[in-house]
Amino acid sequence: MGNFKSVGQEPGPPCGLGLGLGLGLCGKQGPASPAPVSASEPTRAPSSPPLPLPAPEHSPPLTRPPEGPKFPRVKNWEVGSIAYDTLSAQAQQDGPCTPRRCLGSLVFPRKLQGRPSQSPLPQEQLLGQARDFINQYYSSIKRSGSQAHELRLQEVEAEVVATGTYQLRESELVFGAKQAWRNAPRCVGRIQWGKLQVFDARDCRSAQEMFTYICNHIKYATNRGNLRSAITVFPQRFPGRGDFRIWNSQLIRYAGYRQQDGSVRGDPANVEITELCVQHGWTPGNGRFDVLPLLLQAPDEPPELFTLPPELVLEVPLEHPTLEWFAALGLRWYALPAVSNMLLEIGGLEFPAVPFSGWYMSSEIGMRNFCDPHRYNILEDVAVCMDLDTRTTSSLWKDKAAVEINVAVLHSYQLAKVTIVDHHAATASFMKHLENEQKARGGCPADWAWIVPPISGSLTPVFHQEMVNYFLSPAFRYQPDPWKGSGTKGTGITRKKTFKEVANAVKISASLMGTVMAKRVKATILYGSETGRAQSYAQQLGRLFRKAFDPRVLCMDEYDVVSLEHETLVLVVTSTFGNGDPPENGESFAAALMEMSGPYNSSPRPEQHKSYKIRFNSVSCSDPLVTSWRRKRKESSNTDSAGALGTLRFCVFGLGSRAYPHFCAFARAVDTRLEELGGERLLQLGQGDELCGQEEAFRGWAQAAFQAACETFCVGEDAKAAAKDIFSPKCSWKRQRYRLSTQAQGLQLLPGLIHVHRRKMFQATILSVENLQSSKSTRATILVRLDTGGQEGLQYQPGDHIGICPPNRPGLVEALLSRVEDPPPPAESVAVEQLEKGSPGGPPPGWVRDPRLPPCTLRQALTFFLDITSPPSPRLLRLLSTLAEEPSEQQELETLSQDPRRYEEWKWFRCPTLLEVLEQFPSIALPAPLLLTQLPLLQPRYYSVSSAPSAHPGEIHLTVAVLAYRTQDGLGPLHYGVCSTWLSQLKTGDQVPCFIRGAPSFRLPPDPSLPCILVGPGTGIAPFRGFWQERLHDIESKGLQPAPMTLVFGCRCSQLDHLYRDEVQDAQQRGVFGRVLTAFSREPNSPKERHLRGAVPWAFDLPGPDTSSP
């Protein structure tokens, strides 16, 4: 099979394989570094290597200078290349061979078998192996020597001393299982080791649960013929307790019935297990291909018999592409090879029940299963049908018949669309794996006698490759059959189960499949958000996936990216900030994702010196490497190397606005990068435009993502029903599940804002607020000067942004409070509590405080923390429809919430605040807990810093357009900008909660001799004020002579809103600007072309209208 050959009853090749040179057990020694092939090296095949000459009897002792460590030297006799296996120095166990005997062809060497269950590993030995494994794990995630590494070592040591054993964390178990496959010397298909799906079944407590886990494993791995490698890990061996065991050598095997004449009908390799199944209650058939039931054993209990549901066992009837009579032979074989009798050792811990599966190499079926004399032995029957001369071996009838049987196997599996790989492709992939491992680890353990296939030996590249066989940990080991172990507990024969009992076990297992798989399949939902909307969507996604998975919802800055290598399913919901950048809480995730190595570029990227933001934005573009990788993935087979994220399935949803040029750029970059690193995309990137139907787009994508994930992991229920249940307003918010509790603690505003926005905040003080426009203007643009008080957290550079947390207007808050039913006392601090449902084995039902808001009065919540001015989302309208008492209003609200076109028209015409919605639908009864739990958070407003710290130490200047407008084509109510209006009303000494957000990609070039053109209409000039102040400071204080900059500015009228005209003219006179081009869009008697777009060509010396100001 693609992972391991079936080892229970299928011995390896016999002795006499060319003097054992290919076994690599006694290879030459060489220096640590590779050396070129010497001209004196033999070039003939290694069929008869010269024997070493005896040393002279009286030769004087040779004196040699001290040498460094030596490593096995391996040669490829086909191409002449030589390598040195340095990894072999880490071998932790002696091989079966001795200085006088080569035992490399033994199938079950004693040294490769696990310890008896009654012989626990001594504590010191266990500690040593545990330390070695923990060190391996932390080295793999690049955390070696970290505080977490040291704490984990201490934790493991304390656990071993206290209990005699220890427990692996899930990520450690996943790493250990993959490493065990990677280290398996006898497996030819290891290039796929990184794609092994690990199912953690260590919580299993009975044989019935074992059967349920196994059924789920088979269903997942079979995948309707598109086989996937998987392993299920049952509980580890524990001192003083019996083992979990699977008595069958493979999960799916055909019975072998011993006949009275001594012959066997069916598979002779399975006679013994067949008879055991009969003794334990199985009613046998009499066919050649009867699927055996499973004998499963829980600790200290007799084994129990379970029949596999027929729908789980995918079988392939065999036919030949040209020999029509072949189908009449009635041959068939099962799709899934799943070895189930081996022991997994990780860090000294032993797991005696670990069924693992991959896919078949065709020769395992065609040669071993059908042609071996001690198996089905059909070779002569096929030869007779082919009219071959079977009387003499020189006719090569065996070879001819064997080839046609293998052709039939490959043809039949491909016709049935069942994964299989031929021995030529498999061995070629192993050579690639050797090359990969030589680069990555300095070597690769390999057992030549098992790697070379049982057909076409020297026609495959592995035949000509010397190999070194050694044993690393973690590892798979053989173990004695459970019914043969001396002193094994609980192996007695139980009474025969009735057919009804067996059938009932199958029925119970089928009903538990989805539940158990859901408990095992974990989903990580990551969000990156500036406004909180992506977080809200991620939480909705978490509720949906809880229907069939075990999800957790995390902010990107809370997630350690190294965990991606051990994840099964990741869903990303993220917005994009500014010029295609990640949201601030996604910056660390983006940086770490860029530093991970992809499958086609294991070395660092050549552009590592660039800003990660610039590099990350480039990923979302049409990168030739990404295009090449996508094409390779589509054409790939199961012989390709997996990337760093080989076991990851993912899908991404992006939020943005098509009003900006970099729409969903960060989401597109994450989606591309995860695929580039080897992840498998379950669903195409979803995108939600805030200008039109964003929530509807998300709901459709979430449902499709849930459906795709359920199909991939063979779990769950109808996606439409689950999505309807989650997104239904009646199920989203229920009065009886929320209540207000009185809190003694009052609100402190700055700590409260820090709690809500999960970031550091600072208080700045107003120095002045000045209107920059003429008193004759109907609009206002203000210059706000803030005193930072020298706080380190408010240090900035020109080009950075400042985030300000404004309050809502008091009049709006008071009007909304008057609409709340049964509000708490005005001065009483409250918190929302939610009734959490209990779960089996978990905490009982109870009231849990909602942590979103700090304790505060309802008025404070509506003033400082909740957004009451933005148009309500469709989801909130659905909730309000359930609270409307008037049927017509209820119907209208439901229509608006469900019809994206109607909603967008209503939103853009009215742009209503929450209060205006309540005025339009007056029958809505508004409970206070709904406001506190369902309203979006009042988000910080970002402004470009409009000053330079060198020119104004301890100050931050802002250039802010004060927003005021009427909706409904100018006939609706007057709306005000939340932050701009508040800032315009502040007085000297007032406090402003704020923070700095850096913009490292928006800076003046470090080389002052480079030319700069600054283009900004209206308040777009704000950041450039900081640039010219910085440049002026450099000229006058540092004596720099920079290249003069060009400023292109646009406004309406030169006498009304020409911002900073005097400052600009002064800077130009001092050498900061070489040219200042100004366009006035509404200047009386001004030509129509005098807009900003007409001035830009002049800045680049391109043809265009002359818009220079006099």
From Swiss-Prot:
From the UniProt record, report the name of the gene that encodes this protein.
NOS3
Q: Cofactor comment in the record?
A: Binds 1 FAD.
Localization in the cell? Membrane, Caveola; Cytoplasm, Cytoskeleton; Golgi apparatus; Cell membrane
What name does this protein carry? Nitric oxide synthase 3
Q: At which positions is heme b bound? A: C187, Y478
Source taxonomy: Eukaryota, Metazoa, Chordata, Craniata, Vertebrata
Q: Which residue intervals are annotated with compositional bias (Gly residues) in the record?
A: 15-27
Disulphide bond pairs: none
Q: Which residues participate in FAD binding?
A: H801, R941, Y943, S944, T959, A961, Y965, V978, C979, S980
